[in-house]
Amino acid sequence: MLALLVIFSYLIGSIPTGYIIVKKKFNKDIREFGSGNIGATNVGRIAGKKLSKITAICDMLKAIIPVLVTYLFLYLGLLKSNKSISLALVAISAILGHNYTLFLKFKGGKGVATSAAAFMFIVPKAFIVTAIVFFGLKLFTKVVSIRSLIAGVTLFFTTLLFGYDKYLVYATLFACLLVFWRHRANIKRLINGTEK
């Protein structure tokens, strides 16, 4: 059953919402504009704040739905696997689906909104602190990549400090490292002083 949930989570995560929204609205391939990314930030550059917010919400739902389904299966006794391991694997699968979508030759987004949503109901206290940090940093910088990288680190350390199960700590560490990996081009631009 866990294997099926992991596959389900990956497939849901793989739905390229940013690509679909821009394609339907403007008949354009978002990968050919801006950063070439299909996530909410690049959608905002091309299609405006409204569609950016819609994309972010959809990207979050791609992780929330599999996680809530997993909770339901655990509650009903349909899933006998370890709770923390099950939730960690389902969360990571949704993130990997978004970042490496099956539908666009495994080229997807950077996974910030999806990562946040994946852990929203799994490590809620850590999520709240991370959300406060992410949006609070907007007072100091408009550069989304900086806020995203700091948020990734915050999620991991707060999960650790709040004493969540070790498997959830491992999962948030993986998510954090994945955020850094997906932002490697942004990091180079930050070092060069050319990131916007």
Where do the language-model regions lie?
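N-terminal signal-anchor transmembrane alpha helix
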Residues: 1-25
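C-terminal ends of transmembrane helices
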Residues: 18-21, 97-107, 134-141, 184-188
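Short, non-helical or kinked segments that cap or interrupt transmembrane helices
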Residues: 29-37, 103-116, 143-151
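Cytosolic, membrane-interface loops and tails of multi-pass inner-membrane proteins
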Residues: 19-52, 184, 188-196
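Nucleotide and nucleotide-moiety/phosphate-recognizing core
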Residues: 5, 51-57, 61-102, 134-135
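Structural signal for membrane-spanning alpha-helices in multi-pass inner-membrane proteins
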Residues: 9, 67-71, 98, 102, ...
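Hydrophobic alpha-helical transmembrane segments
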Residues: 3-8, 53, 87-92, 127-132, ...
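Interfacial segments of multi-pass membrane proteins
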Residues: 44-48, 70-74, 109-141, 153-162
